Amino acid sequence: DFMKAEAYLALGNTTDAANHYEAGMTKSIAKVQSFGSRDGSADNTFAPDAADVAAWIASKVGEFNSAAATSGLDAVGYPTAKDKMDLLGEQYFIAMYGGAGDAFNFIRRTGYPRTLARSLATPTESGSFPRTILYPSGEVATNPNILQRLDLNTKVFWDTGVTNPAN
């Protein structure tokens, strides 16, 4: 649903984007809540009830609907206000917890969310964002059809080079 929301945003259809944004959060939370039923001794004391979940999702959808399509950046490269893609990216990253590949490709594809944490030591010099990952040495040694990448900045064929201001 988050990918559909992204596609609808690209098409300028914010209504369908918001609907899929909401559906993505709803499904993600339902999946996490289902984990408690797998453990009979789980302490669900702090688990939110359906009303709390619905209210939280409604607040996020309201924030999404009132956000601008785009926003500017401050002197360090953070957004002056979160725009729709920042909000979508944040929730997509939360839903992808444990599935980093999709989140990594999302930021390479879109440059969002622009709210990612930077280096604490030098926030204005966090280095370049990795565009690829090196092949495992065993793969390079046994597969004569591939060459090891020279660095982490070599783009894959579909990488359009969108950069995140954080990097």
Set out the residue ranges of the language-model regions.
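Acidic/polar-rich alpha-helix caps and helix-coil junctions
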Residues: 1-167
